[in-house]
């Protein structure tokens, strides 16, 4: 029901102060009161009802009000506290609605909380004064409140007014219930007695639905942003000003939201969760079963004047060995340094304090000829079945005498193997192979994956700054089918006469833009066939917040290498 605007203060004052005018004959809401009285068996007293008819003449004399800038701000459903129009949003005392002493609690400050504004409750009365209005005789002494006008145009009017308990009008009854449990939010009051009576009470609106008008812009704004955004901003400002004590803090339902998609699009609780999952995936071979197995003999190695890396591996060193003991033992071959194996694949210059040595260590010589001299001093068996010579060197520590340790060098030629030199290498058909055994060179890796999937044209072993293997490699195929078969296999177990090792196969990653937004770098790759593309952080969370995609594991390039 729409009501006209009144300009003359005397007219408004007469509306409320004149107690001698006829009661119901000229009331603008007379028809509704009569229907309510009929439902209540004619038990209402209309002697105190305001006698203001609808004056359409005055309304017609205000054609320019809606077009003025002042009107725009005054008709905003949720005006800011800093900018209050001279006309403002019509309050209960400025409208002749046919109800004497009408006042909506919380209307003038819709974002006040229950606990932060106890003084306002004493100043603002309920819609129907229990001492002066006809409904008070029947409905008891509990003040009533009407539902607020929802900016989204929802169906809140279908719900009954939850005010029989005397609570303030909560303008966010669904977004932020202050009940301690869902059971406390059951509707009561009119709806429990008569739905028809509730509909009549709800029809007593104090103003027509107000359109969403821009306060400063030229064009219309999005209703969803206007309604929800302004609510959130004003609510936060009101709560910050009130700052209730912890003892008076209201109870809330835990973690509920009407728009769960907003939570999914927001920032994750752990901003580094993707990086952590990517690091965990690099060790996935240790906890996953192999999907296929290769067993056989590695191809023989025939070297002519090999060139070695200056770095060698020592396995089976005495547990009480020290860096000084290692340097004193091997400095006869040349100047060297010691790298102790550390956590996360790092090699610190000395063993961690309080930790026992891992049983192996790396020696880094300054010159390649020092490695040659070391190998000549080792005992080895050149007639091994796979053609791989095993070198052993005898050393001693304070508590162990003549301990034989294994020396594993690396020939630089073993780092790369090209099966077809004329074949162009396509990075999009290249896989990354992790968790490689130290005895596996590029030629052997190419032979194994070619036996399993076919189409191998190149294999390479990743090395560090000393050109020593770091336990991973790359294999390129000449067709998409072989490439996808290798990626799908994911985990392959390799069995030889010398070792058994499970390796991990993933797509080879390059620097790429996000293939969703095409505006941000895409450091995260999803290897699942449903996605199989690069993502930025925001697009990853957006895509993988969907049901059925949350189990996908991200891949990242190892920036250290």
From Swiss-Prot:
Listed GO CC annotations: centrosome; cytoplasm; glutamatergic synapse; growth cone; meiotic spindle; membrane; neuron projection; neuronal cell body
Molecular function per GO: metal ion binding; mRNA 3'-UTR AU-rich region binding; mRNA 3'-UTR binding; mRNA binding; mRNA regulatory element binding translation repressor activity; ribosome binding; RNA binding; translation factor activity, RNA binding
Pfam families: CEBP1_N, CEBP_ZZ, RRM_7
SUPFAM superfamilies on file: RNA-binding domain, RBD
Record-level GO BP terms: cellular response to amino acid stimulus; cellular response to hypoxia; cellular response to insulin stimulus; cellular response to lipopolysaccharide; mRNA processing; mRNA transport; negative regulation of cell population proliferation; negative regulation of cytoplasmic translation
CDD domains: Bbox1 (cd19757), RRM1_CPEB1 (cd12723), RRM2_CPEB1 (cd12725)
Subcellular location, record wording: Cytoplasm; Synapse; Cytoplasm, P-body; Cytoplasmic granule
PTM remark: Phosphorylated on serine/threonine residues by AURKA within positions 165 and 196. Phosphorylation and dephosphorylation on Thr-171 regulates cytoplasmic polyadenylation and translation of CPE-containing mRNAs. Phosphorylation on Thr-171 by AURKA and CAMK2A activates CPEB1. Phosphorylation on Thr-171 may be promoted by APLP1. Phosphorylation increases binding to RNA.
Tissue: Expressed in hippocampus and cerebral cortex (at protein level). Expressed in hippocampus (dentate gyrus and CA1-CA4 regions), cerebellum (Purkinje cells), cortex, visual cortex (layers 1 and 2), mesencephalon, diencephalon and brain stem.
Subcellular location, principal: cytoplasm
Keywords: Activator, Cytoplasm, Membrane, Metal-binding, mRNA processing, Phosphoprotein, Repeat, Repressor, Ribonucleoprotein, RNA-binding, Synapse, Translation regulation, Zinc
Biased composition (Low complexity): 176-194
Residues of the RRM domain: 310-407, 429-510
Annotated stretches, region: Disordered: 158-194
Residue positions, PTM Phosphothreonine: 171
Site (Important for the positionning of RRM1 relative to RRM2): 410
Bilayer-spanning residue ranges: none
Region (Necessary for stress granule assembly and correct localization in dcp1 bodies): 329-561
Protein residues bound to Zn(2+) 1: 514, 517, 536, 539
Function summary: Sequence-specific RNA-binding protein that regulates mRNA cytoplasmic polyadenylation and translation initiation during oocyte maturation, early development and at postsynapse sites of neurons. Binds to the cytoplasmic polyadenylation element (CPE), an uridine-rich sequence element (consensus sequence 5'-UUUUUAU-3') within the 3'-UTR of mRNAs. In absence of phosphorylation and in association with TACC3 is also involved as a repressor of translation of CPE-containing mRNA; a repression that is relieved by phosphorylation or degradation.
Subunit structure: Interacts with kinesin, dynein, APLP1, APLP2, TENT2/GLD2 and APP. Both phosphorylated and non phosphorylated forms interact with APLP1. Interacts with TENT4B; the interaction is required for TENT4B-mediated translational control.
Protein's UniProt name: Cytoplasmic polyadenylation element-binding protein 1
Taxonomic source organism: Rattus norvegicus (Rat)
Origin organism lineage: Eukaryota, Metazoa, Chordata, Craniata, Vertebrata
